Amino acid sequence: MARGRVAREEEPELRVQRSEGHYVWDTRGKKYLDFLMGWCVGNFGWGNALMEKPARAFKGPDYVYPGFDYPPWDELAELLVSIAPEPLAVCFRATGGSEAVDLALQAALIHTGRRKFLSLEDSYHGNTLAGLSVGASENREKRKNLLPGCRKVKPPLDEKALARIERELAGKDVAAFIMEPISMNLGVLVPEAGFIAEVQRLCRKHRTLFIADEVATGFGRTGTLFACEQLGIAPDIMTVAKAITDGVGGMGAMLASAPVARSMEKHGVFYSTYGWHPRSVDIALATLRFLVKNEKRLLEDMAATSDYFRSRLQSMAFGKTAEVRVRGLAIGIDFRDEKYTSKLADRCRERGLLTSAEGETLLLIPALDVDRDTARKGLDILADAAGPPAARASRKSRAAASSKAS
């Protein structure tokens, strides 16, 4: 085994040289249209002046010891709470989504005095021991020492799932139910409003906390600032990260209701060496202020772009029956065939389009400000990659002949 290398779970698909706007270039100079955006990180494209300017112009302290105070921390907490769903009231600093989820689970344990958690099967909530424990059960098969008492409810989210949730909560030993309001990892899975309302009722009835994991969906991705808004969710705890700095700095946060926050502040441990680094805070403040100031226009433009994606995808000829799921610019195309989905993502990348194969679903996650022409280019590449093999071969030979002639 070679020394001095970065550990990998699998071989990387791309060696990145640079990024700008809606595009990424690899080390060979090939240009890719990015409909992945770091998996919900770059909401406003790469190298956006809105975030780059405060990052370059920052004149604050290099670092603030977590035991000290730093006024911009309070500014950011106040701004986050002002746009978050009620009853969230207090912010806890984190370096990213995994740490934010860890804090959320710790807060639930402390506040309720219970030791068990309930989540959706095949979900993803981070790479810490706690996040892996409430994620997909395959994690437990590979790692035998994850947290005990983490139970799963299998989709679809129907009456059967509700009955399972009620049985689990009735024991009054579940600290929290955690889910993404709109699950990106489950292929943009959108629960019915009635399902969510009943889950919240059951959580309140059995004094189980509701944790909304908005690490991927927060800050506009699904067509509202937070996916919770669309489903009428009033979470006890919410986690955010990813797009909060548009990829320019690492940051996450756990937001809690006042009662949960009091319990956590009194009995919890939440020291974070690099949580809310001063430079990242400056960038996050610029990002969120832009969102708040331009929310109406941004979301209206997104809605129109979302409709365009939906219309194109629903009429697109795929090699498999496809279910198209679109919420804002969180887009999932479910083929019920993991192998086909993986190959389609590979064909897209070969043609210069970056997407994500999540099991049986192909995810498209473009920047929220993607223009119509760029959206059309990406969808044209997808249509070409998804076309019948004979048609793809014909196009490839024509392109080769044209290149040779020139």
Range-by-range predicted roles:
Residues 1-406:
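Conserved N-terminal phosphate-binding loop of PLP-dependent enzymes in the Aspartate aminotransferase
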